[in-house]
Amino acid sequence: MRDFVIVFGSSSAITNPHHHHRRCYATAPESNRKTKSNSSFTKLLPSLPQQHSPSPASVSATHSLSSHFSNVVRWIPDGSLEYYADFASKLAEDGRIEDVALIAETLAAESGANVARFASMVDYDLLSKGISSNLRQGKIESVVYTLKRIEKVGIAPLDLVDDSSVKLMRKQFRAMANSVQVEKAIDLMEILAGLGFKIKELVDPFDVVKSCVEISNPQLAIRYACLLPHTELLLCRIIHGFGKKGDMVSVMTAYEACKQILDTPNMYICRTMIDVCGLCGDYVKSRYIYEDLLKENIKPNIYVINSLMNVNSHDLGYTLKVYKNMQILDVTADMTSYNILLKTCCLAGRVDLAQDIYKEAKRMESSGLLKLDAFTYCTIIKVFADAKMWKWALKVKDDMKSVGVTPNTHTWSSLISACANAGLVEQANHLFEEMLASGCEPNSQCFNILLHACVEACQYDRAFRLFQSWKGSSVNESLYADDIVSKGRTSSPNILKNNGPGSLVNRNSNSPYIQASKRFCFKPTTATYNILLKACGTDYYRGKELMDEMKSLGLSPNQITWSTLIDMCGGSGDVEGAVRILRTMHSAGTRPDVVAYTTAIKICAENKCLKLAFSLFEEMRRYQIKPNWVTYNTLLKARSKYGSLLEVRQCLAIYQDMRNAGYKPNDHFLKELIEEWCEGVIQENGQSQDKISDQEGDNAGRPVSLLIEKVATHMQERTAGNLAIDLQGLTKIEARLVVLAVLRMIKEDYMRGDVVIDDVLIIIGTDEANTVSGKQEITVQEALVKLLRDELSLVVLPAGQRNIIQDAHCVDDADQENTKSFVSISSTRRPAILERLMVTKASLYQWLQRRK
C-alpha cells in the first residue's frame, strides 16, 4: 500500500515514522487560533450544503477542494495506516472533525486503502471529544453532517456520541424547534434517524408540531412524524393542531398524507379528523369520513360514531340516523352515546324524544349495562328546564339521589333554571337554599339565574336585596331601599336605618343568603349587572350608577349592557339620550351590534323621529352591520300612512332589501299603506276608497309580495321619459293599485317640475281570448278603462290607435265623447283582445293641470 501526505496546519506536532524523512510544518501562534481558522486547508473547506437543495456555489467549492486536495496529497510507498489514523485522532482532539471526515472520505476513495482497518485504528475517545467540543460551540449542523460522512467508512456514529453530547444536542434541537429553524432541525433529525439515533429523546415532539402549525407547514410536520415509532399518535396531534388554528386546508393535507402513509384507516385518526371538522364548523366533511369507512366495509368503533353524532348534534335527523345505523352495525352504545343523544334533543327542543332516550338509559342501568353519570342527569334536566317542565326536572333530581349520584353545581343551576323559566321564584329560591345546605358551592351562573327569575317576575326590590346580601353588605351600610324602580316607576331614596320590613338588606343574619356570602365568594359578572340594569326600569341615573360600579370592579360593559341602557332611555322618551349612548359605544371601544342599532331605531320610530330612524339604518349599513327581522319590521311599521313619493320609495327599498336578506315581511300591512297612498289619487273626485276591498275575493290565495314587488319596480323608474306599465299576470285589483301608484308618482314628479313628454303605455297581456288567462286579461282591461275614463277622466286608447285623436294640447268635448263611444263599443262587442292600452299625453296634461 502506498502512503500519502496531507499538508495541514495543526497545533499538535505529528511525527512521521523513523523511516520517513522528517518534515517541519509551520504552526500558527496560540493567540491566532482563537480568531482565525485552524489551518489554511480548512479555509478551503466548503460550507456544508443543504440536504435537499445544494447550491451551485457549494458544488463549485467542492470541486475546487478536490483539485486542491489532489495537489497536497501524495502517496508514499512504504507508509502505513497507523500514521493517518493517529493524524486523524489528533485533528479530532483539536475539534477539527470536518478534516477527519475529509481524510476518511479520501481513504475510502482509494482502492488500495484498507478503510475498515483505518476505522478500527482511529481513537474513538479523541473523536468523541472533538464532537463534544463542536457541540459546545453550537455547531450542531457540522456535527450531524460529519457523522454522516464518517459513517460511510465504518465508524459507528452512535459510539462517538456519549450522554453529555446527547444532552448538548438536545439543548440545541429544542432551541431550533421553538424558532423559525424548525425546518433545519427536521432536516438534521432525518439524517440522525438514518444513523440510528432515537429522535424522540432529542426534542419534545409536541414542540415541533406546534412550530409546524405556527408556520402552516403540514408537510414538514408529517416528515417529522414519520421519524417517530408511534406515528399515528403524532399524526392525530398534527391534525388537531391545525384544526384548533382553523386551517382546514392544512388539516385535509395532513389527512391525505396519513392515508398514504398508513395501509388501513386508523380509527383514532378518523375520530380526531371528525372532531376537527366540528372545531372548524365543517360538519359535512365529517359525514364524508364516516361514509368512506362504510364504503370500504370498515366498521367504525364507538368512539368514531360518538364523535360523529356530537359534531352533527345540531341535526337531529342525521344524529338519529347514525344511532340507528350503529345498532345495525352491532356497535354497543355507551354512556357518552346517550349523553350526546340527550344533548341533540335539547338543541332541537324535542322533549318527547329526550324522555324516551332517558327511559332507555334507565332501563340499561337497571340491567347493569350502563351507569348514568352526573352529565346525563344534568342534560336531561336542562331539556326539561328549557321546556319549562319543572316537575319533570325535580323528578330527575330524585332519581339522581336514589342511585347515589350527587348533584354538582351545573345540575343545581339547571334545576334552578327550570323553576325560574316557569316563573316559580319561590321554588327557585328553595332549590338555592337546598344547594347551599348540601355544601355545593354556587357559581355566578346560579346567582344570575336567581336574579333573572326575580326580574322576570317583576320582583325588582327582591333582586337588589339578594344582590346586596350576596356581596356581604353590612347592615350599617347606607342603601337606598326604595331607589329601586319598576318599569316606568321611580321612588325617592330612604336611608337603610329608617327602613321597615321592605328594606334592601334583611337584618336577619341567619338568612341563607347572608350565610352564603360568608361561606362563598360571590363575584358579580357583566351578566349580573346586565340583569340588574333591566330592574332599573326607566331610571337612567340608577342604571348609570350600576355601570360605574361595574367598571370599578374591573368589568367592561358589553353590547348587551349598552343596549339595555339605550332601551332605558327609550322608556322615558329620551331619544337624544339613546342616540348619545350609541355614539358613546364607539368612543368606548365597543362596536354596536344589530341589537343596539335596532333598539335605537325602535325608540326613534316610537317617538316619530322617522328621519333619524332611517339615518341610523343607513349608518348601520355603512358599518356593515346586517339588519335583522326586527330592524326591518320596525322601519316598515314606523309610518301609519305615506305622505310623499320619497317615503314610499324609501319603504319599498327596505321591503325589497328585507326579502333579499331572506326575511318574510308583513306584506298585508304594507299593502294597506300602499293602497291608501294610491287611492289618494282619486280622493278629490269624492270617490269611495272601498272599491278595492269590495272585490277582495278575487285575490284570495295570491301572494301579496307580487303586488308590492310590481309597485316597487315602477316606483324606481323615472317618469320624465317614455313610461310603460307592465301588468301581466296581475288581477284587476292589483292592476288598479299599480296604475294608481304610477299616476301618483307622475303627479308628484310634475309638482317638482318634471314634464310629461310622451304617452303612458299599459301592457296587459298577449294570450288568446278563449284561455283562462286571456279572459282574466279582458277583465283587467275593462276595469282599467273604467278607472281611467270614468274616475280620472283620462283618454284611453288601444295601443296603435293614436291617430284617432289629433295630437293637440287640448281635447274638446266632442272628441272626448267620440273617444268614450269608441272605447265603450270596443268593450261591449269585444271584436278582439286589446293587448295594450295607451293614456294620451294631452289628457294626462289636462288631468295634472286640474290636480295642480
Curated annotation (Swiss-Prot):
The keyword Cell inner membrane does not apply. Residues 44-58 have a biased composition (Low complexity). The keyword Repeat applies. PPR repeats lie at residues 334-364, 373-407, 408-442, 443-477, 525-557, 558-592, 593-627, 628-665. GO terms for cellular component: chloroplast. Signal peptide: none annotated. Residues 1-25 form a transit peptide. Its main location: plastid. It is found in: Plastid, Chloroplast. Keywords: Chloroplast, Plastid, Repeat, Transit peptide. Pfam families: PPR, PPR_2, PPR_long. GO terms for molecular function: mRNA binding. Residues 17-60 are annotated as: Disordered. Belongs to the PPR family. P subfamily. This is Pentatricopeptide repeat-containing protein At5g02830, chloroplastic. It comes from Arabidopsis thaliana (Mouse-ear cress).
